[in-house]
Every structure is written in C-alpha cells, then in structure tokens.
A protein has these predicted regions:
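Short hydrophobic transmembrane-like helices used for membrane targeting/insertion
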Residues: 5, 51-52
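Non-catalytic signal-transmission and effector/linker regions of two-component phosphorelay proteins
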Residues: 1-3
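Conserved acidic carboxylate
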Residues: 8
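Acidic, metal-coordinating helix/loop segments flanking the phosphotransfer/catalytic sites
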Residues: 18, 33-51
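Two-component/phosphorelay signaling modules centered on CheY-like receiver
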Residues: 11-32
Length: 52
C-alpha cells in the first residue's frame, strides 16, 4: 500500500479529501494529515510517505 499525507489548510476540504476518496480501492492508506506546509514537511520527514 502507498502511504499518503494530506496537506491542506482548510479543515473542511482536508476532511473531505480524506473521507470522500476510497483510499483502500486505490491501494493507499492515510498516514497523516497536516494543516499547513510546515506541518506537512515535518510529517514527510518523519513518515516518509509515497504521496503528499
């Protein structure tokens, strides 16, 4: 499975991306989410995702 991090500053949009897409059907798992680029960069270093 591919590890995905969702980075989006708008909470409703970020939650919508996470909840409306069938990630399992795409062979993906949500490894984390971030509210801004700085948090996203920290998660990327820590989690080594395949997709951001």
């Amino acid at each position: 499975m591919y590890k995905v991090i969702v980075v989006e500053d708008e909470t409703m949009v970020r939650r919508g991306i996470i909840l409306t897409i069938d990630w399992a059907a795409l062979d993906c798992v949500i490894a984390g989410e971030a509210a801004n680029g700085e948090e996203g960069a920290e998660l990327a270093v820590r989690l080594s995702p395949d997709i951001i």
